[in-house]
Amino acid sequence: MSIKTVKDFSSFAGKRALVRCDFNVPLKEGSISDDTRIRAALSTIEYLKERGARIVLVSHLGRPDGKKNSKYSLKPVANRLSELLGQDVKMLSDCIGSEVVNSTLQMKDGDVVLLENVRFYAEEEKNDKNFAKKLSENGDVFVNDAFGAAHRAHASTVGVADYLPSVGGFLMEKEDKFLGGILKNPERPFVSIIGGSKVSSKIAVLESLLSKSNVVVIGGGMAYTFLHSEGYSIGKSLLEDEYIGIASSFLKKAKELGVKVILPLDHIVADDFNKNSIPEYINSFNIPENKIGMDIGANTLKEIEKVVKTAKTIIWNGPLGVFEFDSFSKGTAKVAEMVASCSGLTVVGGGDSVAAVNKFNLSDKITHVSTGGGASLEYLEGRILPGIKVLEN
């Protein structure tokens, strides 16, 4: 089902648009270390400005546990937005209350203000009706552009929609289009590349994508549980005992469906899990008993390259090795390059794989880099996201 977007709203002129963004950006000593999420909101903000809206931005930042805490103030975001938009973005000292409402009522067309962190109130995460109503008094129309928080049924993502006409912003529309398109009708061959450390956090995504994929590539720490389930020795590598049976059932089901599964057939290993460990190549499915699997090997990469070259659609979620350690990042880097050079539709979702694509400066060569970590994952699991549901036609 498609969502209503800003393009479906008749007129923004003179109206206060309460825009829920995802400005949950990383801060280092009070400075923003990565402004990707702020830039992602600009197209919606510019669109509303051009149409004479009075823009009231709302977001969370970090986990202040329902208490005011200057460490989690959105002030650095207001400063960065002022630079990016080339106009003063006024930072308000709160997100609800008569003083805040009066400030929004005195705005002129094209003005932009930012409310203080909604998570300074415990009621936000409880989706408290009274809090949502107070928040809604800052707008005449609600625009949700916070895909990264769409899997949370909070007051600022879901609750306010009970009190205001509600539409999605361009970022929300884009995420819904690309991730939804992959689940509904992918062009084939469709290759799913799923990495990450734990089967427990990725099995739902794997099961959701299995029936839709032609090929599933499994890498990262979770691959060792799959290898173990097939009878291979994995040394001291990560193993989730309670998921061995589930991994085995998954591989059996893939066989029944005629879906090719690529598991690591060679490895880069180390004596221990340490960034300074010496990498060693093992040309076998089996890992010696005193070694830990840390990355995929050259033969595995060749197998992946074969399927990526001919793919018409690729979804990649999760790194294929311990990419945060430089000595064990080559597998993930090579896969990032392969995905970037694929001529088909490519979507990268999930925090770590997005970080990998950014680390290797390849994001502009990917069709769509998802901004939602947990939200992307839940969407790909086939779950209904509350923040999207309230925007459906």
From Swiss-Prot:
It comes from the Bacteria. InterPro entries: Phosphoglycerate_kinase, Phosphoglycerate_kinase_N, Phosphoglycerate_kinase_sf. Substrate binds at D22, F23, N24, R37, H60, L61, G62, R63, R119, R152. Its EC number is 2.7.2.3. GO terms for molecular function: ADP binding; ATP binding; phosphoglycerate kinase activity. Its main location: cytoplasm. ATP binds at K202, G293, E324, G350, G351, D352, S353. It catalyses: (2R)-3-phosphoglycerate + ATP = (2R)-3-phospho-glyceroyl phosphate + ADP. Pfam families: PGK. Monomer. It is found in: Cytoplasm. It comes from Borreliella burgdorferi (strain ZS7) (Borrelia burgdorferi). One of its GO terms (cellular component) is cytosol. One of its GO terms (biological process) is glycolytic process. HAMAP family: Phosphoglyc_kinase. Gene3D superfamilies: Phosphoglycerate kinase, N-terminal domain (3.40.50.1260). Keywords: ATP-binding, Cytoplasm, Glycolysis, Kinase, Nucleotide-binding, Transferase. Pathway: Carbohydrate degradation; glycolysis; pyruvate from D-glyceraldehyde 3-phosphate: step 2/5. Disulfide bonds: none annotated. The lineage of its organism: Bacteria, Pseudomonadati, Spirochaetota, Spirochaetia, Spirochaetales. Signal peptide: none annotated. Belongs to the phosphoglycerate kinase family. This is Phosphoglycerate kinase.
